Amino acid sequence: LEGVHKSPKGREWLPFVVRLYFYGGSEQVKMVHSFVYDGDQNKDFIRALGVRFDVPMREALYNRHVAFSCADGGVWSEPVQPLVGRRILTLDKTGNGESSLQQQQMEGKRIPSYEAFDEKNRALLDHWASWDSYRLSQLTADAFSIRKRANDNNPWIGTFSGTRSEGYAFAGDITGGMGLELHDFWQSYPSSIEISDAKTPVAALTAWIWSPDAEPMDLRHYDNVAHDLNASYEDVQEGMSTPYGIAR
């Protein structure tokens, strides 16, 4: 698949090629995305670049889940609406058996529908926070962060940090979802994986090839004067020190 990126104002630049690989008997799809820089290095800076997928969300907020890989095989996961607060959620006066509803939720089990709870417990569900967006960002080779926010009008807050994430994310509900792995995630920093619109019927899962959390991609030469070949192997010549045509 070949195409070109188009800005909201209509400008077309950064041609790309997408290759898709399908395997018999497997639900996995491999996608290879390549793009070519064809801009002006002195004025065209890439703020962010990514590939976005839609993920249907069919269940109640507390039956929706997100997860990110951390370092050394670790996983960070959370429900879109965690069932935790000052009061314990219960189904009836006798309790909920061997484990709490909050524990069952963390184990990925189905929590009963809203209508199954009495008025007191519905009030808890009505007032507990839910989260719309999550972002895993690897901005250096040795540090990643996981942040989340409730909505577009409020700030991102930190939830976890570590060294080198393996670049995997999941978004979905207890009936299914979508997993995504960005190859060479920490090696190709600054990169991010973002889950947004998690509280809507269709969430977005975005693999950021260049993270919006980082400084814009600046492909200019590091200096504007020559440093003499006798002193160092560097030179600056008109039309020579240019990134035009490089690809990733």
What are these model-predicted stretches?
Residues 1-248:
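Beta-strand/loop-rich accessory regions of lumenal/periplasmic or secreted enzymes
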